[in-house]
């Protein structure tokens, strides 16, 4: 898209004076032109100098660097976002690799824990259970009228930090910031939402500054009815919206996705987004290791909704590569806190029961106890891939990693739990324990590892590589649903962008500086899949590419003309 041409298209604005300066989507600060200052009654409200956005970015970046903690930097960036969104996204675009860990993981975890302390200004919607009969009114109160993407959480399972109540709002805000920074979704079209159903976190309930509903979490039929009321209200207000479920507890995440995925355009990023980015990374890693995904034996530590969602996506890809469903499932070993999931374990959840190993098939295994531990699985199954989604730090021990490497010359190891404090193993340790042989991708950002004079880049298996492209593809195609085929297309497009798989060297995943183009590529493949599966209108490839560019918002200042309400 031609930035200069786009910037010449004027916007007609009914606001003026201090009100205009308080409108983050429209405020330009010191970049208002002389003509605009005269037209919109801004004279005297701004310093004399008229600046370019580049000059504003330079000042903002200097101020950013003056803060010495990541949390302070997070607060500073959020303040810019709440003051001047165009400047915020231009700043992110200029320093994305440096700032993504600040606006999202790992720093957003601490911001959620301290949400009620660092709260400055309202953003998004707080829909509390006591006000459940007024949800329609709340949606009408939203400052953005043409909402196209909603990210909603109930705050119960925030990253690996557990129940944060309304502090979980930091996650939808951060996710939508990445929809815009990485996927070009206009901030005018996005809305973060937290469903305040109480909290079971005693630290929040006993905190005099906690800003949420001070009540134990509602559950069961009351909870489900409340979510249903919210979904119905959203469908009435914005029937074509894309809704992303975010950080719901395991007991609710999969049931909500199953209940609503065929009723509106929605997906769960923890289950489907994590699965898609992990699958894309695994396809690329398999190619880099000289094999295919169908040839891998994969062990998971963590058998919750996220881990099982990843496993099901991997199985679907293995089937696409020629295995039967039964053959694919025998290659997947799910381990949780009780050990390997087998057909003899009681009280398994529905989505876990499809991923059990038959205990009879393990009769020849040598194990240390009746419960089959992760180390037992590694010793007997000889996995080539180890994936951590446990939320528990340090569980990929030296003994486990070395045992895996003794059977696999090029192990693929992915400690995906975040934030950084929850990672199953540090990439530096994995590289050392495997003598530099492992392909490593992590859930949180890590610096490259230096080992025996060689530099090993550590790919961050970040959902930001996937969900912005999915959102852009849905908007560009007008898709009515998010299908498994669309998610599979996103994974394959991500794998195709891997420098390591393509060139034989470099990182497993693209550099963040290229993420906007990656999002465009993913959006195109997602949109094509939507058309093939009948959930979007058929168009030519050229028309689809034009729609993607048309929907890709860029952080530039446009000229303003005065109009009336």
Curated annotation (Swiss-Prot):
Pfam families: malic (PF00390), Malic_M (PF03949). GO terms for biological process: malate metabolic process. The keyword Repeat does not apply. Its EC number is 1.1.1.38. GO terms for molecular function: malate dehydrogenase (decarboxylating) (NAD+) activity; metal ion binding; NAD binding; oxaloacetate decarboxylase activity. The record marks 270 as: Important for activity. Disulfide bonds: none annotated. InterPro entries: Aminoacid_DH-like_N_sf, Malic_enzyme_CS, Malic_N_dom, Malic_N_dom_sf, Malic_NAD-bd, Malic_OxRdtase, NAD(P)-bd_dom_sf, NAD_malic_enz_proteobac. Keywords: Metal-binding, NAD, Oxidoreductase. It catalyses: (S)-malate + NAD(+) = pyruvate + CO2 + NADH; oxaloacetate + H(+) = pyruvate + CO2. Divalent metal cations. Prefers magnesium or manganese. Its cofactor is Mg(2+); Mn(2+). NAD(+) binds at residues 157, 270, 418. SMART domains: malic, Malic_M. One of its GO terms (cellular component) is cytosol. The active site is at 104 (proton donor), 175 (proton acceptor). HAMAP family: NAD_malic_enz. Belongs to the malic enzymes family. This is NAD-dependent malic enzyme. It comes from Edwardsiella ictaluri (strain 93-146).
């Amino acid at each position: 898209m031609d930035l200069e041409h786009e910037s010449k298209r004027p916007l007609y604005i009914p606001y003026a004076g201090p009100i205009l300066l308080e409108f983050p989507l429209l405020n330009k600060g010191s970049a208002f032109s002389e003509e605009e200052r005269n037209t919109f009654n801004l004279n005297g409200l701004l310093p004399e100098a008229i600046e370019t956005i580049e000059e504003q970015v330079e000042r903002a970046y200097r101020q950013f660097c003056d803060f010495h903690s990541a949390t302070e930097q997070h607060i500073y960036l959020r303040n810019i976002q709440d003051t001047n969104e165009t400047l915020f996204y231009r700043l992110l675009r200029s320093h994305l690799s440096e700032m993504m860990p600040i606006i999202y993981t790992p720093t957003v975890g601490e911001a959620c824990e301290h949400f009620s302390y660092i709260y400055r200004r309202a953003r998004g919607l707080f829909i509390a259970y006591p006000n459940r009969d007024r949800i329609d009114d709340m949606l009408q109160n939203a400052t953005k009228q043409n909402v196209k993407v909603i990210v909603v959480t109930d705050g119960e399972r925030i990253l690996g930090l557990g129940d944060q109540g309304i502090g979980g709002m930091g996650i939808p805000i951060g996710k939508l910031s990445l929809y815009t920074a990485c996927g070009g979704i206009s901030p005018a079209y996005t809305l973060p939402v937290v469903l305040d159903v109480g909290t079971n976190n005693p630290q929040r309930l006993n905190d005099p500054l906690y800003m949420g509903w001070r009540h134990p979490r509602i559950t069961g039929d009351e909870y489900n009815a409340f979510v249903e009321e919210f979904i119905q209200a959203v469908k009435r207000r914005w029937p074509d919206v894309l809704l992303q479920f975010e950080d719901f507890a395991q007991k609710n995440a999969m049931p909500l996705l199953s209940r609503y995925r065929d009723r509106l355009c929605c997906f769960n990023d923890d289950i489907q987004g994590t699965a898609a980015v992990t699958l894309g990374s695994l396809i690329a890693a398999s190619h880099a290791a000289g094999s295919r995904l169908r040839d891998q034996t994969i062990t998971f530590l963590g058998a919750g909704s996220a881990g099982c969602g990843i496993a099901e996506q991997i199985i679907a890809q293995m089937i696409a590569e020629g295995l039967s469903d039964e053959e694919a499932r025998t290659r997947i070993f799910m381990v949780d806190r009780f050990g390997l999931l087998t057909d003899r374990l009681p009280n398994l959840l529905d989505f876990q029961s499809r991923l059990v190993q038959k205990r009879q098939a393990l009769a020849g295994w040598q194990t240390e106890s009746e419960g089959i531990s992760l180390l037992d699985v590694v010793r007997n199954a000889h996995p080539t891939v180890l994936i951590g989604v446990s939320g528990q730090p340090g569980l990929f021990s030296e003994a486990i990693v070395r045992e895996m490497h003794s059977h696999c010359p090029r192990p693929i190891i992915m400690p995906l739990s975040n934030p950084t404090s929850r990672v199953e193993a540090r990439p530096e340790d994995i590289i050392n324990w495997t003598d530099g042989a492992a392909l490593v991708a992590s859930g949180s950002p890590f610096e490259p590892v230096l080992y025996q004079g060689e530099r090993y880049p550590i790919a961050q298996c970040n959902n930001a590589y996937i969900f912005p492209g999915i959102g852009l593809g849905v908007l560009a195609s007008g898709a009515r649903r998010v299908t498994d085929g669309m998610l599979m297309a996103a994974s394959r497009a991500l794998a195709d962008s891997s420098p390591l798989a393509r060139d034989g060297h470099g990182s497993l995943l693209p550099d963040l500086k290229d993420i906007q183009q990656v999002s465009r590529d993913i959006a195109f493949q997602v949109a094509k899949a939507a058309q093939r599966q009948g959930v979007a209108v058929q168009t030519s490839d050229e028309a689809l590419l034009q729609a993607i560019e048309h929907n890709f918002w860029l952080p530039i200042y446009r000229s303003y003309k005065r109009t009336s309400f």
